[in-house]
Amino acid sequence: MIWLEENMIKITFCFFKVIFILLLIVFSSAMLSIVERRLLAVFQNRYGPNRVGWMGSLQLCADMIKILFKEDWIPPFSRKFIFVLSPVIAFTSLLCVIPIIPFTSHFVIIDLNIGILFFLMMASLSVYAILFAGWSSNNKYALLGAMRACVQTLSYEVFLGLSLMGVVAQSGSFKISDIVNSQKYIWNVFPQFFGFLTFLIAGLAVCHRHPFDQPESEQELADGYHIEYSGMKFGLFFIGEYISIITVSSLIVTLFFGGWLGPWIPGCIWFILKIIFFIFLFILIRAALPRPRYDQVLLFGWKFCLPLTLFNLFLTAFLILV
């Protein structure tokens, strides 16, 4: 009790930091959906959303009103508790990774000693949301999407973890702030280029983004695992995808591109600019690449990404020993 009284100010400040960052990320994810639609329209030589507000600036408000007033329907043939739980897991799993990411040298909410392992754990947890959603919907298309997600996870989870082991070996720590500080003289993307490449590919798969959106491919599975969802439950899945994009982009920046480190301008501005670049890259990949066949995705993971990751790990170990 004495310890609680002495540290009440620190606890209160930390609590408000968590609330502020999480609300900022959720709002940014909602705005990102509009930004993506506008950018895709530019890439495809069309207008995009431009009717609500000036140049479509109020489209987000219109979308929120539409989702909030839609019928929140639960199919009578579904397993109701798991059906309701699935979008909550999808929304919170990668959102919980945000507090362990250092925004500057002085602004980090929770500086975990096992930050990398915590991210891998939460990335694995996000797959359960898809599995539960597909199974509890009692719909064949949803179940096929969930099965695709599970099998796809078996291929990318392996090289997702191994791609980070080279960074961990080079910095000598699982703590994300230590990894950023180890990049004062050279970013990890140069000695760990193969690790960065495979982590970027695995990050696309974690977010279920093009070209790894097999669990929800509209042309084949009619929206896949969330075919039975509507209203706010569908909104949680929708926003959860954009939260995962921001989370993975933040991790790429901190692990391979020096985080807040950079010349001339403040560190927080560097951090935000780097994140914006990778978010733009994710959108560009969606606009440019087609969706491959399901078996091609699995073969690509096992025959290209995994050997490349192992080669990067052995090369890193050799350079450290030499």
Swiss-Prot record:
Location in or out of the cell: Cell membrane
Chief location bin: membrane
GO terms of biological process kind: aerobic respiration
E.C. code: 7.1.1.-
Enzyme class, broadest EC rank: translocase
GO cellular component, one term: plasma membrane
Keywords, sorted A to Z: Cell membrane, Membrane, NAD, Quinone, Translocase, Transmembrane, Transmembrane helix, Ubiquinone
Lipid bilayer topology: Multi-pass membrane protein
Catalytic activity: a quinone + NADH + 5 H(+)(in) = a quinol + NAD(+) + 4 H(+)(out)
Keyword Transmembrane: yes
Transmembrane segments: 15-35, 50-69, 81-101, 114-134, 149-169, 186-206, 237-257, 265-285, 302-322
Pfam families, alphabetized: NADHdh
PROSITE patterns named among the record's database cross-references: COMPLEX1_ND1_1, COMPLEX1_ND1_2
Example of a GO MF term: NADH dehydrogenase activity
Family the entry assigns: Belongs to the complex I subunit 1 family.
HAMAP family found in the cross-reference section: NDH1_NuoH
Stored PANTHER family: NADH DEHYDROGENASE SUBUNIT 1, NADH-UBIQUINONE OXIDOREDUCTASE CHAIN 1
Function noted in UniProt: NDH-1 shuttles electrons from NADH, via FMN and iron-sulfur (Fe-S) centers, to quinones in the respiratory chain. The immediate electron acceptor for the enzyme in this species is believed to be ubiquinone. Couples the redox reaction to proton translocation (for every two electrons transferred, four hydrogen ions are translocated across the cytoplasmic membrane), and thus conserves the redox energy in a proton gradient. This subunit may bind ubiquinone.
Assembly mode: NDH-1 is composed of 13 different subunits. Subunits NuoA, H, J, K, L, M, N constitute the membrane sector of the complex.
Protein name listed in UniProt: NADH-quinone oxidoreductase subunit H
